[in-house]
């Protein structure tokens, strides 16, 4: 073959070292020097015979060879070109990069270095694993031929650096060097593995121009590019036009069909393949098995694996590994471990990927015993030094909570990569050991390994889970400046979710706004993290802001986002807009129906809730736990005890669901609201739910509203025994005991221990006006309250004298009376809402309170809604009150 190369401008390949100056030699100056004519031939440098170096290299005496080279250099002697090449070959065989570097530094030991010798030097560096040095030699070469380019491309191929292979091809074309039929497949392999289909198309055109289309090896490589890059149409057309097709070509096009989910067509191709006289080989079967697993059809893949035996083809390690990884990918992890066991029984030796897959299954299942067994197998079979196996073991032990074992494996991994460090850091973060995680995070950088985006995100997530959002924010701010790693959408989502998790909603919303001005826009995860934080009356405006972002980003096409919006609008007080979103949804699942049904129940609208329930059943949607608890509450609002009881008993009988605490609590509410307290108490005893605080709180509400002091005392005694340290509970119990004593009831239970020192919880209310949240406290003495709000509060309040029993109701409140503790916070909030919205034709005042609203404030809110013609939405710890025209949605039961 003709040598193809393009000369380039001369470059200094290396700085030659001049021989040492001979001592005591006279200094000769040009001017005084006389010409000395001599007709004798100049003496050539000493040439060391090849036999000496051959002997040293054959016996592995590379140290002696190195000394001999140094001696030659000092003497100014030379070695033959063939000797130098043999020395380089010895370095390759022995992997002696040290001697190789010495040979490079002594490049002047032979007189005429050429492109072949330089290419050999390049190969030496590449095969010894020093690809950066190989590239330096390549870039410094005075001329490069086809063999030079082949050596460099081969070096990158061995390192799986496929993008560099594609880049070198482009440089090669610029230099005017054309690949041959041996180099084309290597370059095409690089294009296929890095997904560079455009480079593959360029090579395809070059191949046609060079007339190499008939070369089967090259054609198969072109087909592989189209197949692996997902270009099914190109692959099919090229395959059909191939003059000659061997089993490799058929396998490539089969792979293309399987990767594109066309498995039935792939099976038909196999039949066509057999008609052409080509028998499907092991690789063909493996492709089909892998394809079915990828599609989630593991049973079909298993059938194929059994069927191949009837064709006389025995499954190899790749078949078993494809089956094991396919089962894991499709969530069938126990079956995958069983397949791993069967593989051993079949006498097939696993490879590193098989071990890694088995460890992954153990990790997901958190079966530490089986994981330890796989670890032992990895040690016995020599896979423990494989970095991928080591990484999977670290991950498995970390997820199983065995951090000491994980650390032992981590420390034993010799060539740790970023994933090794990430696995151990993740383990520490998940266990709450952020200090140890940060120590590794620092050590990783000291080891000249830069943390990637996963490392930073893991550290941020760890601090957030530990409740230390300050450290999380510090890392969030440092990562781009110090770590040179750009934040991604997941980073923003983590920090936003962290602030929400730790109760810092305002900071989370501010970050959300900043995120929209960054390179990475919010996604569905961002929205789903934020919306629950807005699911209260103060979040109404923020919900609309988030909804605007959803529309701008076209996230409303995501079903989960629409469900969340339906739920959040209802909880933030806008049930009508919640219904609008619901009606606009083409597909409605059980979560969609539950969101609006629950919203109607929250707003006290039992009629629409029951109508939706019937409509849902008509459309064939089966109710779940959440649906049924909402419907029992709806019947409670309606006062229809018998229908509520039917729904409760249908939970187990019709829907085969075990009734949960939420259903029992709803039933107690149902009985209590209907003043059927004896039945409620009997239900509590029958269901054996006496140890649940929410049950007695619901029961006590019925006792309080209907004025049954004896039942109230019974409920109070149970509440106090369950939560003796709860201040709110103790306050209520104290009031009931005091009222019972006043009414002459004998008290057998233990009284609260802090009767004299008891302080009731401080009432607080919040209201949003002009995008600012204002806080008011009971007995507030701020300038705003004393100068502006007190007169209005006095004006709008009905100051009736109240007794311990008001219309038959027991006067038992979480908050102290206004005569002793001052005006309650919600009255200040209502007054501030009225002042701030004066002049508005239709006003809705939204207030959030931390305690149960007392009867006096409840009556005041009804009066204000009628007197001033405004709607008041007030959410306390019991329910959402909607005051309108002098009425409340709770029907005075809360």
From Swiss-Prot:
Keywords: Repeat. Residues 771-801 are annotated as: Type E(+) motif. Coiled coil: none annotated. Pfam families: DYW_deaminase (PF14432), PPR (PF01535), PPR_2 (PF13041). The keyword Repeat applies. GO terms for molecular function: mRNA binding; zinc ion binding. Residues 803-894 are annotated as: Type DYW motif. This is Pentatricopeptide repeat-containing protein At1g19720. It comes from Arabidopsis thaliana (Mouse-ear cress). The lineage of its organism: Eukaryota, Viridiplantae, Streptophyta, Embryophyta, Tracheophyta. The gene is DYW7.
């Amino acid at each position: 073959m003709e040598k193809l190369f393009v000369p380039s401008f001369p470059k200094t390949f290396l700085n030659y070292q001049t021989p040492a100056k001979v001592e005591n030699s006279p200094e000769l100056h040009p001017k005084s020097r006389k010409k000395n004519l001599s007709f004798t031939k100049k003496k050539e440098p000493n040439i060391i015979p090849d036999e000496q170096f051959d002997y040293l290299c054959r016996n592995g005496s590379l140290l002696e060879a190195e000394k001999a080279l140094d001696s030659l250099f000092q003497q100014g002697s030379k070695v033959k070109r063939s000797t130098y090449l043999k020395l380089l070959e010895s370095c390759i065989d022995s992997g002696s990069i040290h001697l190789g570097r010495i040979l490079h530094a002594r490049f002047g030991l032979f007189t005429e270095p050429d492109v072949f010798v330089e290419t050999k030097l390049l190969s030496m560096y590449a095969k010894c694993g020093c690809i950066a040095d190989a590239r330096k030699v390549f870039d410094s070469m005075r001329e490069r031929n086809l063999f030079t380019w082949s050596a460099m491309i081969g070096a990158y191929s061995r390192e799986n650096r496929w993008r560099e292979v594609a880049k070198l091809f482009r440089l090669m074309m610029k230099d005017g060097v054309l690949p041959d039929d041996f180099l084309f497949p290597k370059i095409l392999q690089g294009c296929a593995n890095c997904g560079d289909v455009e480079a593959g198309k360029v090579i395809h055109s070059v191949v046609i121009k060079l007339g190499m289309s008939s070369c089967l090896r090259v054609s198969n490589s072109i087909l592989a590019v189209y197949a692996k890059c997902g270009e099914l149409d190109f692959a099919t057309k090229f395959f059909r036009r191939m003059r000659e097709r061997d089993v490799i070509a058929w396998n490539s096009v089969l792979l293309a069909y399987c990767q594109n989910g066309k498995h039935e067509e792939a099976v038909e191709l196999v039949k066509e393949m057999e008609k052409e006289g080509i028998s499907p080989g092991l690789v063909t079967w493996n492709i089909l098995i892998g394809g079915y697993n990828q599609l989630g059809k593991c049973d079909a893949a298993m059938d194929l694996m059994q069927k191949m035996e009837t064709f006389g083809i025995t499954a190899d390690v790749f078949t078993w590994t494809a089956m094991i990884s396919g089962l894991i990918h499709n969530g069938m992890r126990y079956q995958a471990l069983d397949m791993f066991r069967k593989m051993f029984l079949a006498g097939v030796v696993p490879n590193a990927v098989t071990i890694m897959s088995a460890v992954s299954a153990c990790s997901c299942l958190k079966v530490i015993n089986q994981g330890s067994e796989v670890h032992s197998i990895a040690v016995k079979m020599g896979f423990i030094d494989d970095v991928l196996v080591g990484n999977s073991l670290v991950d498995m032990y970390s997820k199983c909570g065995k951090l000491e074992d994980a650390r032992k494996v981590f420390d034993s991994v010799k060539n740790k990569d970023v994933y090794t460090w990430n696995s151990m850091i993740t383990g520490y973060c998940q266990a709450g050991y952020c200090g140890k995680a940060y120590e590794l995070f620092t050590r990783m950088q000291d080891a000249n390994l830069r943390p990637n985006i996963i490392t930073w995100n893991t550290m941020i997530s760890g601090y957030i889970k530990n409740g230390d959002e300050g450290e999380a924010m510090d890392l969030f701010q440092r990562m781009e400046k110090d770590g040179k790693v750009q934040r991604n959408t997941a980073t923003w989502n983590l920090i936003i979710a962290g602030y929400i998790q730790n109760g810092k909603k305002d900071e989370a919303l501010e970050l959300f706004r900043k995120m929209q001005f960054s390179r990475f826009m919010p996604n569905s995860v961002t929205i789903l993290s934020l919306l629950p934080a807005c699911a209260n009356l103060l979040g109404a405006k923020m919900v609309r802001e988030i909804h605007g972002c959803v529309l701008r980003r076209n996230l409303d096409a995501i079903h989960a986002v629409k469900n969340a919006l339906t739920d959040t609008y209802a909880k933030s007080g806008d049930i009508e807009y919640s219904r609008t979103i619901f009606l606009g949804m083409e597909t409605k699942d059980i979560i969609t129906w539950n969101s609006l049904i629950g919203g109607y129940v929250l707003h006290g609208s039992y009629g629409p809730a029951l109508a939706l329930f019937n409509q849902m059943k008509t459309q064939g949607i089966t109710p779940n736990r959440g649906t049924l608890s909402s419907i029992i509450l709806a019947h409670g609002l309606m006062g229809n005890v018998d229908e509520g009881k039917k729904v409760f008993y249908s939970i187990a009988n019709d829907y085969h669901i075990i009734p949960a605490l939420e259903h029992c609590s709803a039933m107690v509410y149902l009985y209590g609201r209907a003043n059927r307290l004896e039945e409620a108490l009997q239900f509590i005893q029958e269901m054996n739910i006496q140890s649940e605080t929410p049950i007695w709180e619901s029961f006590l509400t019925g006792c309080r509203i209907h004025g049954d002091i004896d039942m109230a005392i019974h409920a109070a005694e149970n509440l106090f025994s369950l939560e003796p340290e709860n201040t709110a509970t103790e306050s209520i119990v104290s009031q009931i005991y005091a009222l019972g004593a006043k009414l002459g009831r004998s008290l057998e239970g233990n009284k609260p221990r802090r009767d004299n020192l008891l302080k009731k919880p401080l009432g607080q209310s919040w209201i949003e006006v002009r995008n600012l949240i204002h806080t008011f406290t009971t007995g507030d003495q701020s300038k705003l309250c004393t100068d502006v709000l007190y007169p209005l509060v006095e004006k709008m309040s009905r100051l009736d004298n109240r007794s311990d029993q008001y219309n038959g109701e027991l006067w038992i409140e979480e908050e102290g009376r206004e005569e002793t503790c001052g005006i309650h916070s919600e009255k200040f909030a209502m007054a501030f809402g009225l002042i701030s919205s004066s002049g508005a034709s239709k006003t809705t005042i939204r207030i959030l309170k931390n305690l149960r609203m007392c009867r006096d404030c409840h009556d005041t809110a009804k009066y204000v809604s009628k007197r001033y013609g405004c709607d008041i939405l007030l959410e306390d710890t019991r329910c959402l009150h909607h005051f309108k025209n002098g009425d409340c949605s709770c029907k005075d039961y809360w």
